[in-house]
A protein has these predicted regions:
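N-terminal regions that are enriched for targeting/export leaders
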Residues: 10-80, 86-88, 368-370, 377-379
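Surface-exposed coil loops of outer-membrane beta-barrel proteins
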Residues: 100-116, 136-241, 245, 284, ...
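Residues on the lipid-exposed face of transmembrane beta-strands in outer-membrane beta-barrel proteins
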Residues: 33, 69-75, 124-128, 159, ...
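Transmembrane beta-barrel strands of outer-membrane/channel proteins
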Residues: 31, 35-39, 85-89, 157-161, ...
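Signature for the C-terminal beta-barrel architecture of outer-membrane proteins
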Residues: 184-312, 316-323, 330, 341
Length: 436
């Protein structure tokens, strides 16, 4: 859903910079491109009853797919200033209209069916860096990054249109559905209801402070005017989100790792599950939506290289779950983690095997709402026998030639949509990715 770019470098937990650079080339402009195609099938599963927003067993499409093509253009403006723009095309059709699950099995899938393809500007922003001193750091050429030199202590300001996941809840091992884990609740923190339109992008500003092994980030960005829709409140005054994250780089037995702590608050037009429970008959979120509703939450996010070939990650995320999901998915608490093994162990340097899991849950008031037949943008079986939604994901990513990768991905999901009367269901995906 939200499109980020990460690299699988020599160390499992890697940086895109050199603290003591041996080369210091800088660029005035650059251009990159990526293309990703994902096709997914699912098996038949136990389906004793269904509701309006159920994952369908019979009567669903036989194959879901998505495709994206993104251009990355960057230009140097003046000292410390850069401008980036990303034109993008998307085509896709999800299983069951993207309903019946919280951990959607394709991280590239947007909210809604798009056939034929749509075209839009995914990102358009300016970045200003103010160097404050310290060691020289060389930032390598890449998507949305000009090759340049900065100092280890610096302030970076970004303003425009971007994805919050470009900056927050990063993780070298699990962050990019184009090259890593596919499931929504494994690729990022499931309970992080990050501000975004239905394509995964937002508008606003980010400020970052870097000093050696510490990084502090804060952002004020737009939320959708109506939950899970495309239209954002670009005034940043009525429907908005604030987040702060601190990151620390560390060493464990001489192996690199990172720990991140993120807090967020969403302020916008949302309905309260508790308010619906006073209604007679089937509860309805739309009728209790109110402006100025708040949702708060946090994320703890760690990654660690264990050996030169093996890395691990773990995330715990939580939000208060009192109000409806405004931008991501129906999860109010989530534990996810996994391991990635590099192919250098079997002389395939750029291959990787990943094994990950997610255990997702929702607030008690949402459980009661769904049991009484209520609907959310993602869930609604007519009733439910609640249990956590549990997903196991396994993938093998094979390097084909420079910039090209093919991935075979398997996911096993228990209790889809938090309903232990339904499922389990298995998904098999093939992903083709190219970047230049």
């Amino acid at each position: 859903m939200c499109f980020v770019k990460s690299a699988f470098a020599v160390s499992i937990v890697a940086n895109d910079y050199d603290l003591f650079p041996t080369h210091t080339e800088t660029e005035t402009w650059n251009a990159h491109i990526q293309s990703t195609y994902i096709t997914t099938t699912k098996d038949h599963f136990d389906d004793p009853y269904r509701g309006e927003n159920s994952l369908l067993n019979k009567g669903d499409i036989s194959r879901s797919y998505s495709g994206t093509v993104t251009g990355y253009l960057g230009v140097h403006l003046w000292q410390g200033a850069e401008y980036y723009v990303n034109p993008e095309a998307f085509i896709g059709i999800p299983f069951s209209g993207l309903k019946g699950m919280s951990g959607i099995p394709n991280g590239e899938m947007q909210k809604g069916t798009e056939i034929p393809a749509i075209y839009y500007l995914a990102r358009s922003y300016i970045r200003q860096t103010v160097n404050l001193g310290g060691e020289t750091v060389h930032l390598h050429d890449g998507a949305n990054q000009l090759s340049t030199n900065v100092t280890s202590e610096r302030i970076q300001l970004t303003y425009g249109v971007f994805s919050l996941l470009d900056y927050f809840d990063n993780n070298t091992i699990s962050h990019d559905p184009r090259t890593q884990f596919l499931n929504w609740s494994i690729m990022t923190a499931g309970a992080y209801d990050f501000a975004a339109d239905s394509r995964g992008y937002t508008y606003g500003g980010v400020i970052e402070y870097f000093k050696n092994e510490w990084t502090l980030r804060a952002a004020h960005v737009a939320m959708p005017r109506v939950p899970n829709q495309i239209d954002l409140d670009n005034s940043l005054t009525h429907d908005y989100a604030d987040q702060v994250e601190i990151t620390h780089d560390q060493k464990f037995y001489d192996q690199p790792g990172k720990i991140r702590f993120l807090v967020f608050r969403n302020h916008g037009f949302m309905g309260s599950y508790k308010d619906t429970l006073f209604q007679i008959g089937t509860p309805d979120l739309l009728s209790v939506r109110r402006s100025g509703t708040n949702k708060v939450g946090y994320v703890i996010n760690g990654e660690q290289t264990i050996t030169d070939h093996l890395g691990a990650f773990l995330r715990w995320s939580w939000n208060d779950g009192k109000s409806e999901t405004e931008a991501f998915t129906d999860i109010s608490h989530s534990l996810s983690g996994g391991l990635v093994l590099k192919g250098s162990l079997w002389q395939r340097e750029n291959d990787a095997i990943g094994l990950g899991f997610a255990i997702n849950g929702i607030n008690e008031s949402e459980i009661q709402y769904l049991k009484r037949g209520g609907l959310t943008p993602f869930l609604g079986d007519g009733t439910m026998n609640y249990n956590t939604e549990q997903t196991l994901e396994l993938y093998y990513s094979a390097h084909l030639f420079k910039g090209a990768f093919a991935t075979l991905d398997y996911q096993h999901m228990n209790n889809p949509g938090y309903n232990q009367d339904r499922g389990p269901v298995d998904f098999i995906s093939l992903r083709l990715h190219y970047e230049l």
